[in-house]
Design a protein with these regions (language model features):
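Transmembrane-helix signature of polytopic, membrane-embedded enzymes
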Residues: 2, 79, 88-111, 144-146
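Short helix- or helix-capping micro-motifs
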Residues: 2-6, 105-110, 137, 151, ...
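Transmembrane-helix motifs of polytopic, lipid-linked glycan transferases
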Residues: 4, 71, 75-96, 134, ...
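Extracytosolic helix-loop segments that constitute the early lumenal/periplasmic catalytic or substrate-binding loops
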Residues: 9-15, 25-57, 61-64, 224
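Aromatic-rich transmembrane-lumenal/periplasmic boundary elements in polytopic membrane proteins
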Residues: 16-37, 185, 189-249, 387-396
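Short acidic/glycine- and proline-prone juxtamembrane loop motifs at membrane-interface regions
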Residues: 20-21, 77, 114-125
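Specific aromatic-rich, kink-prone transmembrane helix
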Residues: 87, 108, 127-146, 150-151, ...
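Transmembrane helical bundles and short interhelical boundary loops of multi-pass, membrane-embedded
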Residues: 170, 180-185, 189-194, 198-208, ...
Length: 402
């Protein structure tokens, strides 16, 4: 029910704002090229692109089904974002085994502004998040073939999935001590990743397609170029944000800003700000500290609790690696991939508090109400509604949000 209602929020007025928003200019263009050429082109010449094709193929599917317009560009992201809410709840049920905490997980996912914004924008990160959650859910269910396939699709969306692949396979090896299974999963996920480049293999127009004597060698050469781009990306951007600031939403990314007429005031504002619901994320920062402490205690006691371990694994894989790229240009919205696991950490904190003293249910309820009100307050700048400049300015709590 929560996922269904969230889907409505994601598709309602999905064509707003008009035109290409932020990096949609790259990914929608790439999706159009896939439909026309099978690969990405620039003025009828091969185009150097730095992300794998899966997410762009999903955007292309939306365009094919619904048309080459804003709704068609964004519908795949809206579906993916709605599914992340459902999948986070499924994972919560597997690790908490209690419908109350499952419901709370789904509700908090639905009340996160970052998830809403990313679900209404044709970028790749929401697809990465979807496949990571599908992989984790499959792993917890013991469906190892699905686990491998979804890991491959995650890597085929964005390379940052590799951190999840490494950590999850190491965890599988440590917990089950089955090296053969881990190798099979790794090989299968790698094969799925390579297969995701099928458009490049079957076309003579792909970038570096014929730079070497055979397609595999050419793809390896191309990947070296992609790696060079990613490791050398240090160009300054007005909305780049150090990972230290992500949890508190210190520098959210403005995807769109205009000053149109139509709000009834002298000056109007229309913005799409990729920011998490502030109160939710601030509680998440506290919950992460708690989560680390509980895991350290369990490690010292040699205890294993998936309800404690899974949220930490997700946050570590999705968040920690970015601290090692202090000179690289990065953005707060990259946090969407570990957002479900941060919410699981919040739910874990609520669960511990309630089990310690049932009276904490009143505090938990109050926190949910405050998060919901915070979400509603920021809703206009999550969805690009036209509001007065004063109303917009009132929502810029920190100067770094402008």
């Amino acid at each position: 029910m929560i996922s269904a209602l969230s889907f409505f929020l994601r598709i309602f007025n999905l064509a707003t704002p008009k035109g290409l928003v932020f990096d949609e200019v790259y990914y929608v263009d790439g999706a159009r090229d896939f439909l026309k050429y099978g690969v990405e082109m620039n003025n009828n010449a091969p185009e150097f692109v730095v992300h794998p094709p899966v997410g762009k193929w999903l955007i292309a599917a939306g365009i094919k089904l619904f048309g080459n317009h804003e709704f068609g560009w964004r519908i795949a992201a809206a579906i993916a974002g709605s599914l992340t809410i459902y999948l986070a709840a499924r994972i919560a049920m597997r690790i908490f085994m209690d419908s109350r905490w499952t419901t709370l997980t789904a509700l908090l996912m639905a009340l996160d502004g970052l998830n809403l914004v990313m679900s209404r924008t044709a970028l790749l990160d929401i697809f990465l998040t979807l496949f990571i959650l599908l992989a984790v859910n499959s792993w917890l269910a013991g469906r190892y073939l699905n686990f491998a396939v979804f890991l491959g699709l995650a890597m085929g969306s964005k390379w940052s999935a590799l951190y999840f692949v490494i950590l999850l396979l190491l965890l599988e090896l440590v917990l089950n001590r089955n090296l053969i299974r881990v190798i099979k999963i790794g090989v299968t996920s790698g094969a799925i990743y390579i297969f995701s480049w099928i458009g490049w293999f079957t076309s003579n127009n792909g970038w570096d397609r014929k730079v070497k004597s055979n397609p595999i060698s050419s793809l390896i050469y191309y990947h070296k170029e992609m790696l060079g781009f990613h490791t050398g990306l240090t160009e300054k951007h007005s909305y780049q944000a150090n990972p230290w600031s992500w949890l508190v939403m210190g520098r959210p990314t403005s995807f769109y800003y205009q000053s149109p007429a139509g709000c009834g005031a002298k000056t109007c504002s229309q913005e799409v700000l990729a920011i998490g619901t502030p109160i939710l994320w601030w509680i998440g920062a506290i919950a992460l500290i708690f989560l680390i402490g509980v895991n350290l205690h369990n490690f010292a006691m040699r205890e294993l609790d998936f309800a404690v371990l899974i949220p930490l694994v997700g946050v570590v894989a999705g968040y920690l690696p970015w601290f090692f790229f202090q000179k690289r240009t990065v953005f707060t919205f990259y946090a969407i991939v570990f957002e479900p696991f941060l919410i699981l950490a919040i739910v874990l904190l609520a669960k511990f508090a309630y089990e310690y003293d049932a009276k904490f249910k009143y505090l938990i309820g109050l926190a949910v109400v405050l998060i919901a009100l915070n979400f509603l307050y920021f809703y206009p700048i999550f969805t690009g509604q036209i509001i007065s400049y004063n109303a917009w300015s009132a929502r810029m709590w920190w100067s770094s949000w402008i």
